[in-house]
């Protein structure tokens, strides 16, 4: 049986996750199980993962700090930017143009910045919205 108190290899690491659906939250869940602090940023309407059912949402969010922010507003983007400035890892699942609109273009190029895990539906066409129903994080 998994016991979180025995898995602390990522203690002291902060993960900011604003990826939606399954792969991003699942990746964040794995990092949290290894001791990382996970901050999940959701839209004010909640994570679309909730449409899969409450048990699924709760399983993917267990142990995470949940913050709601409207990333389409200046205030929400400022809140996210502040979280990212303190993060060691950032998990996203948005198109490059959306990152640019949020002022986060080049997130992976920041000197001494966080590790950026970007989960996209199609690496050949990253601007095309999409989601692969198969999770490759296992």
Label the predicted regions.
Residues 1-136:
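N-terminal helix-loop segment corresponding to the beta1-alpha1 unit
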């Amino acid at each position: 049986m998994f016991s979180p108190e025995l898995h602390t290899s990522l203690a002291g690491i902060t993960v900011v996750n604003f990826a939606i659906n399954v792969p991003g939250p699942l990746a964040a869940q794995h990092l949290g199980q290894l001791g990382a602090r996970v901050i999940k940023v959701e839209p004010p309407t909640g994570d679309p993962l909730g449409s899969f059912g409450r048990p699924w949402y709760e399983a993917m969010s267990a142990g995470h700090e949940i913050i709601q922010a409207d990333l389409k507003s200046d205030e929400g983007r400022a809140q996210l930017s502040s979280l990212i400035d303190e993060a060691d890892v950032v998990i996203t699942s948005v198109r490059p143009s959306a990152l640019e609109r949020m002022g986060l273009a080049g997130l992976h190029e920041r000197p001494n910045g966080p590790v950026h895990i970007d989960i996209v539906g199609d690496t050949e066409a990253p601007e095309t919205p999409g989601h692969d129903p198969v999770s490759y994080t296992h």
